[in-house]
Amino acid sequence: MKAIITVVGKDKSGIVAGVSGKIAELGLNIDDISQTVLDEYFTMMAVVSSDEKQDFTYLRNEFEAFGQTLNVKINIQSAAIFEAMYNI
């Protein structure tokens, strides 16, 4: 399983640490990561994977709830969606 995680919110310390900790807690591996601050807003994109099958509804709910604790918006999408778009 491969997925794309995006994080957007007002910049503050601890966002990368918190999100990467949650990724590890959920049994996902960070394959690639990019983050920047645009004006005063933090943005991050990570490609994550797992050898095990993952329930995207569960992951989506977990990241949404966790994002609220950091005051950021966290989304997760299957990488298969993006791969399918390029195969049409």
From Swiss-Prot:
Domain of life: Bacteria
Gene3D superfamilies (alphabetical): 3.30.70.260
Domain ACT: from-to ranges: 4-77
A Pfam family recorded for this sequence: ACT_6
Similarity-based family: Belongs to the UPF0237 family.
Subunit and partners: Homodimer.
NCBIfam families in UniProt: PRK00194.1 (NF001220)
PANTHER family the record matches: UPF0237 PROTEIN MJ1558
Name the record gives this protein: UPF0237 protein SP_0238
Organism: Streptococcus pneumoniae serotype 4 (strain ATCC BAA-334 / TIGR4)
Higher taxonomy: Bacteria, Bacillati, Bacillota, Bacilli, Lactobacillales
